[in-house]
Amino acid sequence: DILENGQINKKINFKNKKVGFSEPTFVIAEIGINHNGDMKIAKELILKAKESGADAVKFQTYITEKRVPKNHEVFDILKKCEISFENQEKLFKYAENNDILSFSTPFDKESALFLNSIDCPVFKIASFDTVNHNLLSCVSDLKRPIILSTGMTNISELNDALKIIGSADLALLHCVSSYPLYNFNAD
C-alpha cells in the first residue's frame, strides 16, 4: 500500500464512500454528545451536517456506568447525554433516510457489539482508548474499518494498538489532545 515515493495508496470503503489517496476529503461532522441527550437536537444536527456538505456524522456510544463511577463528577453529565441503543438506532436510520453516513465511537464492548448489530460502517476509537486492548480486540474482530485517534498515544502504545488491530482497514488520525493548542505542542 506504500508507493515508492512514500505516499500511502490505500483506499478504505466507509459503506458507500471511498476514503484515501486521491479521493476527495472526507468531512465528518462530530455530533458526539452535543445533542445533550435530546433526540430532536440530534436530528437537527444531522440535518445541519447534511446541509453543510459533510459526508458523515459521528456520535458517541456508551453506557455511562461502564465509563465512570456513579460518584464521579461527570457522571450526571454523561448520563444526561447518553442515548439509548434503541434511540441510537433511530438516529442511524434518520441519517440514512437523509442521505448522510453515520457512525460512532464505542467506549465499551457492549456498545461496539450493538453498533455492529445495526451495521455501523466504521468504528472510531478515541485517543484515550488506544491503550484499551480489550476494546481494540473486540472492534478488530468485527472486521469493519477503524478510525484510530492517536492524540494521547506514544509510539510504543501505537505500535501495540496496531498489532492488536492487525490487518483491518485502518485510518490513523494524528491529533493533539490538549486545548487550547499551544504552538509548542503543534507538530
Q: Which sequence ranges carry the predicted segments?
A:
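Catalytic cores and adjacent flexible loops of soluble metabolic enzymes
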Residues: D1-D187
